[in-house]
UniProtKB/Swiss-Prot annotation:
PANTHER family: CYSTEINE--TRNA LIGASE, CYTOPLASMIC, CYSTEINYL-TRNA SYNTHETASE. Monomer. It comes from the Bacteria. The gene is cysS. The keyword ATP-binding applies. This is Cysteine--tRNA ligase. Its EC number is 6.1.1.16. SMART domains: DALR_2.
C-alpha cells in the first residue's frame, strides 16, 4: 500500500499529500545559519524539525533517493560587523561559528545533510543568475547596486498571502531614492571603503558581494536544479527571504515553479518573551551544553510541541522533558529489547504533518505498558516498541546505565557506597545517613536491596 505523508504547505495554506516530482530523486533544501554568532535555541528548533522531516522522507523513499541540502551563509553584513567588533578576520569568525554549529547539531542528534554548501563558494552561480535577471528586465543597475524589480514578478505576494503595502509597512527601506520601487531588494551591492577584501568579489558590476536572498536561490539551483520538492525554514523567513527567493528564481527560470512544498517551523520564546540580547534572555545551544543538559533532553523538548506552533523555553519544560526520558529509560531497564518494525499508530502520527506531540504520547503509552504488563513477553514487546519509536525520532541512543550515570564519577560514588555499606555493618547509622544525604545533594539516589546490596542512579 502506498504510504501517504500529509505535509502542511505554506504556499497553499493546506495540508497536502506529499508527492515528489521523482520518487527516486526527492529534493529538499533548508536555510542554514548565518555564521556570525553562536546558534541560539531558536535556530536549533529548525535544525531538529528538518532533521525529523529528513528521517521521515528517507523512511518512505529510501536513503539513496533523498538529497538534503542545508546551506551555510558565510557572506553577510552581520559577519563583517561582528568580525570587526571582535578584532578577528572574517575567516576566523566564520570557521569558528560553523564548527560550533556542527557541534550543536551533533549534540541534538541531527543527521548530516547530503550537501552543506557555503555561499562564498558559489559566487559564480549567483552572478550568472543576476545576469539572467538583468537580461530578462527583472533586475536593473542603480548607484552601483543591482536591484530586483519586485513589480516585474508575477504573484510576488503568493507565499505571504498579504498585499504589497502590508508586507512593507514598518519595514526600513534602504536606498529608496535610487530604486524604481521602494520594495525592490538588492541582488548585488558594491564594496565599501576599508572593507575586508575576502568579503568582496569581482563581478560585472565591480567589486562587491551578493544580497542575502540570491544566495539560497543560487545554491538550491546548483544542487537541486530549477525545481525541487521541499523548502524549509523558520516562519520568520516567509517574508522577505523566501518571498524574494521565489520571485527571483521563477523570473530567472520562467518554466520553473521553484519549490513545490514550503514548510515553516514556529517561533521559540523564552519564559513567554521574545528572545533578545537586550532582555538578557538570549540562550545559545552552547549555554545548554555548558549547563550539562543532555542533548536528548533538548531534542525531546523541541519535539514536544507541533512544529508549526510557537514553543516556549523555560526550566519546567526542560525538566519535564528530562522526566519523560527518565521514564522511558527506566521502562527498558533490564529488558532484552529488540528493534522491531515501527508501530503503525506511531508512524501514522508522523505521517500526519509530523504530529510529534501524538508520537511522544504513543511512546509514553508503551512505557506505561511495560510497568503494567503481566508477562515477560508483553514487557519485552512494549520495551522494544519504546526503543524503536524513540530511535526513529533521534532519541534514546544510550543504554539506561549510560543515561542515568552520565557525567558521574563512578569511582567516587562506588567508594562512598562501599563506605556506607561498611558503616551499616558497624551499625554506624549516623555515618550511613550522612553519606546517603551527601550523595542525594549531588543528585545520586541510593536503593538498598533486600539481599544487602545497594544500587545507585543519577536523579
Amino acid at each position: 500500500m502506498q504510504i501517504q505523508f500529509h505535509l502542511y504547505n505554506t504556499l497553499s495554506r493546506t495540508k497536502e499529500v506529499f508527492n515528489p516530482q521523482d520518487q527516486a530523486n526527492v529534493k529538499m533544501y533548508v536555510c542554514g545559519p548565518t555564521v556570525y554568532y553562536n546558534p541560539h535555541i531558536g535556530n536549533s528548533r529548525s535544525g531538529v524539525v528538518y532533521d525529523l522531516l529528513y528521517r521521515i522522507v528517507i523512511k518512505i523513499f529510501g536513503e539513496k533517493a533523498v538529497k538534503y541540502v542545508r546551506n551555510i551563509t558565510d557572506v553577510d553584513d552581520k559577519i563583517i560587523d561582528r568580525a570587526a567588533l571582535l578584532g578577528v578576520t572574517i575567516d576566523e569568525l566564520t570557521d569558528k561559528v560553523t564548527k560550533e554549529f556542527h557541534k550543536n547539531m551533533a549534540y541534538l542528534g541531527c543527521m548530516l545533510p547530503s550537501i552543506e554548501p557555503k555561499a562564498t563558494k558559489h559566487i559564480d552561480v549567483m552572478i550568472a543568475i543576476i545576469e539572467r535577471l538583468i537580461a530578462k528586465d527583472h533586475a536593473y543597475i542603480a548607484d552601483n547596486h543591482v536591484y530586483f524589480d519586485v513589480l516585474s514578478a508575477p504573484n510576488y505576494t503568493e507565499l505571504s498571502n498579504r498585499n504589497l503595502e502590508e508586507m512593507f509597512e514598518g519595514v526600513h527601506v534602504e536606498n529608496s531614492k535610487t530604486k524604481k520601487n521602494p520594495q525592490d531588494f538588492v541582488l548585488w551591492k558594491p564594496a565599501k571603503q576599508n572593507e575586508s577584501a575576502n568579503m568582496n568579489f569581482e563581478s560585472p558590476w565591480g567589486l562587491g558581494r551578493p544580497g542575502w536572498h540570491i544566495e539560497c536561490s543560487a545554491m538550491s539551483y546548483k544542487y537541486l536544479g530549477e525545481n525541487f520538492d521541499i523548502h524549509g525554514g523558520g516562519a520568520d523567513l516567509i517574508f522577505p527571504h523566501h518571498t524574494n527567493e521565489i520571485a527571483q528564481s521563477r523570473c530567472a527560470f520562467p518554466s520553473s515553479t521553484y519549490a513545490k512544498y514550503w514548510v515553516h517551523n514556529g517561533f521559540l520564546t523564552v519564559n513567554g518573551e521574545k528572545m533578545s540580547k537586550s532582555l538578557g534572555n538570549f540562550i545559545t545551544v552552547r549555554d545548554l551544553m555548558d549547563k550539562q543538559i543532555q542533548g536528548e533532553v533538548v531534542r525531546l523538548f523541541l519535539l514536544s510541541s507541533h512544529y508549526r506552533r510557537p514553543l516556549d523555553y523555560n526550566d519546567k519544560a526542560i525538566e519535564d522533558a528530562k522526566k519523560t526520558l527518565n521514564y522511558w529509560y527506566r521502562a527498558i531497564e533490564n529488558i532484552n529489547v529488540q528493534k522491531i518494525d515501527l508501530p503503525h499508530d506511531f508512524m501514522q502520527s508522523l505521517l500526519d504533518d509530523m504530529n510529534t506531540p501524538l508520537a511522544v504520547k504513543i511512546i509514553n503509552d508503551y512505557a506505561k505498558g511495560v510497568f503494567i504488563s503481566k508477562t515477560e513477553e508483553e514487557r519485552q514487546l512494549n520495551a522494544s516498541a519504546i526503543i524503536t519509536c524513540a530511535n526513529f525520532i533521534g532519541l534514546m541512543n544510550k543504554t539506561p546505565n549510560e543515561w542515568f550515570n552520565s557525567g558521574v564519577d563512578e569511582l567516587y560514588v562506588n567508594e562512598l557506597v562501599n563506605k556506607r555499606l561498611e558503616a551499616k555493618k558497624q551499625k554506624n547509622w549516623l555515618l550511613a545517613d550522612q553519606i546517603r544525604n551527601q550523595l542525594l545533594e549531588e543528585k545520586i539516589i541510593l536503593e538498598d536491596r533486600p539481599d544487602g546490596t545497594t544500587i545507585w542512579r543519577k536523579e
